[in-house]
């Protein structure tokens, strides 16, 4: 959540939708945050269920179908905005998680979150990250993300926001063609803040070149 009540109103000066990502360590944390955001000028809520569930020994909400469904139901009861459930790739079968949040009443899903990785400092002979493990993002995870978006698109009937290693229009189009209704750019923005604009322009160029009148023609065209 934003650290100040001034942050969200500040963003309203821009002609775009505002999506707030919500994290928590317990169901109560999520519910409390969502209730507070109900009074803010926010368009959509993205619920990050990759967070560890303290009451369940630290297992992420998004790794247990019953927990994912329960947190979705709890959030939907109090949410005043549409709810997007952000799915973790660190599971045996991501379609089971997608089905769980769909059953819980989610309005959409976003995927994938970061993969869990580890880095060792060989000179100091210790972990390079204080938490021992950390999220891996960027181009390396893109093929995995495309595969999971494809799987989820064929398993549920909710809109999908595809993400994971998108740097170019081609990367974004891959996501769209396997079923994503929208895409998100994360890590690439740290290298080039104009990445998102370049991706949008690139998609438009592709559509013009290939005589695609409506991007909906591309959503899920690869099955």
Tell where the protein language model's regions lie, with residue ranges:
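Structural signal for hydrophobic packing residues in well-ordered secondary-structure cores
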Residues: 15, 38-41, 76-79, 203-207, ...
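C-terminal helical cap(s) of enzyme catalytic domains, especially alpha/beta-barrels
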Residues: 120-134, 176, 188-213
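Alpha/beta enzyme core
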Residues: 25-161, 167-185
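Short Gly/Pro-enriched loop/turn and capping motifs at secondary-structure junctions
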Residues: 166-168, 190-191
């Amino acid at each position: 959540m934003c650290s100040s009540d001034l942050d969200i109103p500040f963003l309203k000066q821009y002609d775009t939708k505002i999506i707030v990502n919500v994290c928590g360590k317990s169901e109560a944390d999520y519910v409390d945050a969502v209730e507070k955001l109900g009074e803010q000028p926010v368009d959509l809520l993205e619920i990050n269920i990759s967070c560890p569930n303290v009451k369940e020994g630290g297992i992420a909400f998004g790794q247990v179908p019953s927990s994912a469904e329960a947190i979705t139901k709890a959030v939907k009861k109090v949410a005043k905005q549409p709810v997007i459930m952000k799915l973790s790739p660190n599971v045996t079968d991501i379609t089971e998680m997608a089905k769980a949040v769909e059953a819980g009443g989610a309005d959409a899903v976003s995927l994938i979150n970061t993969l869990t990785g580890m880095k060792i400092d060989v000179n100091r002979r210790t972990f390079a990250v204080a938490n021992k493990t950390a999220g891996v993002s960027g181009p390396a995870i893109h093929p995995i993300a495309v595969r999971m978006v494809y799987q989820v698109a064929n398993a549920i009937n909710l809109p999908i926001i595809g993400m994971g290693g998108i740097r170019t229009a081609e990367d974004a189009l891959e996501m769209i063609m396997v079923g994503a209704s929208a895409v998100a750019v994360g890590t690439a923005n740290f290298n080039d803040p104009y990445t998102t604009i370049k991706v949008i322009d690139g998609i438009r160029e592709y559509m013009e070149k290939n005589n695609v009148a409506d991007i909906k023609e591309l959503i899920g065209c690869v099955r």
